[in-house]
Amino acid sequence: MKNICLLGATGSIGEQTLDVLRAHQDQFQLVSMSFGRNIDKAVPMIEVFQPKFVSVGDLDTYHKLKQMSFSFECQIGLGEEGLIEAAVMEEVDIVVNALLGSVGLIPTLKAIEQKKTIALANKETLVTAGHIVKEHAKKYDVPLLPVDSEHSAIFQALQGEQAKNIERLIITASGGSFRDKTREELESVTVEDALKHPNWSMGAKITIDSATMMNKGLEVIEAHWLFDIPYEQIDVVLHKESIIHSMVEFHDKSVIAQLGTPDMRVPIQYALTYPDRLPLPDAKRLELWEIGSLHFEKADFDRFRCLQFAFESGKIGGTMPTVLNAANEVAVAAFLAGKIPFLAIEDCIEKALTRHQLLKKPSLADIQEVDKDTRGYVNSILT
């Protein structure tokens, strides 16, 4: 029996993680969890899984949950301290970080210090502080297991292989909601249009990131840290069907790919069961004859400027990826709120990157300060 801490339970990854736990109740137990403000969604989860500790995102939600009575004993935590408390509980074996944004960084570091296995779905943790997280994981001998479908695919393709034999990583991208639209057409797209992802069921922020290709850019930076691969050896290819989740090319030019129908429960479950595999009820079998053909295109930096920003920020390193991520989070929130048009997301990010004075080897405090400063700057140009 593995004891699980789930940070970000009411998000898309969180819900699908609970699907996996529900399917294997003899293998997993949820001992702690967190959510932000969605108490209507969280309460049924709490009643079903009966965690010992629940952390919430704000004081109002904290008071509401405190007033509720459950049939079991459950402690309530708040904010970052609550996230940390949930992650470092003595009983916890695996911390699933499904939080949205850079809020996932500190709880991850604290969990690593307590030698908890990390199942990482929170891209921003490695994007903003990859060097610190990797050093921490190495120091405490803690595995970082990828939950993203692309990184899980690479991780699976590398089983039994030696890192020295890798030629390049090939990360696939669906292209998002607007993959067939021209730059001119993108000027007038709506929030509703952007949230219609053709292949995956995801939360609002990541669906917008998919439409701008920032999601793929963040995944490139994450792959760099997870697999210790230079950016020059990471490629992105557009693949509309989302059947090949990513590939690894070796020095002899052979390529190993991981395939499957689009279902986030599969990489989530693999991270939880690694190195074993379990059956996954209701998972759809891949029948290639039904699909008939797969399509691929080269990713165009002129068409997807956020992807270019991510590659450039990653190569520069230091605090630049922190700026990239913070500016993107604020700009996407503004787009979702109807405050700016879709293409203005790129403009906000570019202005923040151009303005930034690079710190090459930032401390954790430096990263937090740059994150705060960038958010303040982008908010100021939006008002």
UniProtKB/Swiss-Prot annotation:
Chain residues that bind Mn(2+): D148, E150, E219
Pfam family membership, one: DXPR_C
Any one biological process term the GO annotation gives: isopentenyl diphosphate biosynthetic process, methylerythritol 4-phosphate pathway involved in terpenoid biosynthetic process
Enzyme class: oxidoreductase
Keyword tags: Isoprene biosynthesis, Manganese, Metal-binding, NADP, Oxidoreductase
Manganese found in the keyword field: yes
Protein name per the record: 1-deoxy-D-xylulose 5-phosphate reductoisomerase
